[in-house]
């Protein structure tokens, strides 16, 4: 059993060398900011439903006999504004299914944010309690001694988690600070935790900065930078997106030491309430052990808020009030 525990530790260690990859990564991070920081839930004032589907390293084939192996992630989020008394709140719920070879993760998250309007900007605070269920198929792992795996199939473990964050915006500048994995969790599948290394959820701190520059009333440029650290390493994503008439957009991103991304999107309906986007990633570093292309689809539909203090404009042949 020592060999099995050692192999399990090596598997987790190799999967967490790039600490930012311990959680699902999305190329549309600039359009899905509440996933980065819970304080940004409905930060744009819109209740919405968001869907993301990501296929990473498309066409990757593992060296063992099992099919698949490339990461694939499905994401569903619902968020809305709430007005409880005088408290301007926002509520969001997220479901994520992430599959990576023999490992399958399911996340259920609940976000709560408080948006406070100030004289020179807006301050937002947010928390996100969540539950993670992690499944590992030991039958797909290769051991030096195959007898170590006899009788072992899929093992699962569930653990709570907590994220928190704050954001501040003034005019065209917004920045947000966040921290993930405030509750320590070790996914050891009932094995001796002293014999397994590299399987813990590492606490990660994040900074998200966004600026909007208007060339005209129809065209604006929106650069976004996301930096993450676990205090032993730093990774970053940089994106620049051009938006025309709030209707169509195009952009380019660079993910630290990994990939270049091209993004395209378009908003439909008269009020632009339905948005569809596509991201194409091309790996520029360490491409020998993976396929160089990834694809991601983005879909968002804006919904009316559950309750609102805004008085609707009612038009009749004689009155407008």
Q: Predicted segments — roles?
A:
Residues 1-6, 19:
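Short, Lys/Arg-enriched, disordered terminal segments
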């Amino acid at each position: 059993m020592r060999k099995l525990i050692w192999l399990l530790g090596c598997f987790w260690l190799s999967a967490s060398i790039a600490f930012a990859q311990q959680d699902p990564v999305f190329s549309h991070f600039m359009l899905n900011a509440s996933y980065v920081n819970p304080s940004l839930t409905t930060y744009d004032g819109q209740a919405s439903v968001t869907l993301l589907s990501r296929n990473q390293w498309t066409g990757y084939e593992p060296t063992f006999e099992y099919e698949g192996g490339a990461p694939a992630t499905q994401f569903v989020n619902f968020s809305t504004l709430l007005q409880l008394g005088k408290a301007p709140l926002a509520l969001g719920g997220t479901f994520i299914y992430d599959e990576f070879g023999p490992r399958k993760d399911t996340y259920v998250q609940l976000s709560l944010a408080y948006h406070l309007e100030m004289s020179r900007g807006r301050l937002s605070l947010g928390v996100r309690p969540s539950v993670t269920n992690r499944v590992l198929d030991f039958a797909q792992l290769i051991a030096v001694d195959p007898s170590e795996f006899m009788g072992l199939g899929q093992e699962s473990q569930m653990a709570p988690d907590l994220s928190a964050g704050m954001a501040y915006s003034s005019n065209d500048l917004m920045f947000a600070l966040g921290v993930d994995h405030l509750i320590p969790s070790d996914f050891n599948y009932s094995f001796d935790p002293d014999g397994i290394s590299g399987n813990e959820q590492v606490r990660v701190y994040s900074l998200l900065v966004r600026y909007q520059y208007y060339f005209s009333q129809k065209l604006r440029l929106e650069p976004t930078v996301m930096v993450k650290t676990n205090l032993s390493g730093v990774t970053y994503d940089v994106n620049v997106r051009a938006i025309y008439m709030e209707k169509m957009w195009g952009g380019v991103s660079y993910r630290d030491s990994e990939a270049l991304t091209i993004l395209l999107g378009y908003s439909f309906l008269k009020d632009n309430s339905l948005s569809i986007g596509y991201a194409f990633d091309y790996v520029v570093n360490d491409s020998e052990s993976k396929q160089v292309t990834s694809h991601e689809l983005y879909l968002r539909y804006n919904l009316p808020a559950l309750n609102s203090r805004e008085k609707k404009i009612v038009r009749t042949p004689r009155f407008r009030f």
